[in-house]
């Protein structure tokens, strides 16, 4: 209503239209704080007055979600609960958090691998690789991005350990 917004993910069915703000951080230990939750809620509040056409039908937003690969601060969780903002983080909520979703689906992102450097991870992203299983299906990808055979073997061992847990 007030300004133009981009939505990272939009999901809908017959009854709902959901806006998802996805926050990705690659710095270990970083937490999503209350400012992030406030920002997402403000965007949702601005957008919920607009009408969107998805699936050939005019719709109003019914829910706003914040999804992140980090943990939330206690204040962010308290605010989200108070304002009914759906939040999914590394360890929140207790059931259905990002860790559980990854483990239940078996869709482990390769970014969790400690045996790859940041530069190697960037190269994999640049060629469209996201999941450990993508590398498992085609281990040659690792040598294609510059790993030596022995390095690739170590990465494959880690993938085996990660994907079997």
For each feature predicted by the language model, list its residue ranges.
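Intrinsically disordered, low-complexity Ser/Thr/Pro/Gly-rich regulatory segments
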Residues: 1-109, 120, 125-128
């Amino acid at each position: 209503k007030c300004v133009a917004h981009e939505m990272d993910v939009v999901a809908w069915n017959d009854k709902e239209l959901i806006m998802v703000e996805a926050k990705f951080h690659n710095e270990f230990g970083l937490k999503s704080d209350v400012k992030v939750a406030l920002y997402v809620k403000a965007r949702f509040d601005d957008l919920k007055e607009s009408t969107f056409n998805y699936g050939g039908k005019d719709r109003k937003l019914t829910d706003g979600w914040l999804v992140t690969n980090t943990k939330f601060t206690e204040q962010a969780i308290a605010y989200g609960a108070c304002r009914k903002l759906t939040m999914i983080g590394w360890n929140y909520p207790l059931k259905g958090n990002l860790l559980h979703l990854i483990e239940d689906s078996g869709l482990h992102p390769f970014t969790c691998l400690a045996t790859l450097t940041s530069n190697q991870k960037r190269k994999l992203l640049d060629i469209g690789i996201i999941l450990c299983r993508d590398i498992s299906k085609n281990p040659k990808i690792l040598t294609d991005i510059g790993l030596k055979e022995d390095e690739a073997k170590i990465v494959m061992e880690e993938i085996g350990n990660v994907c079997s847990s």
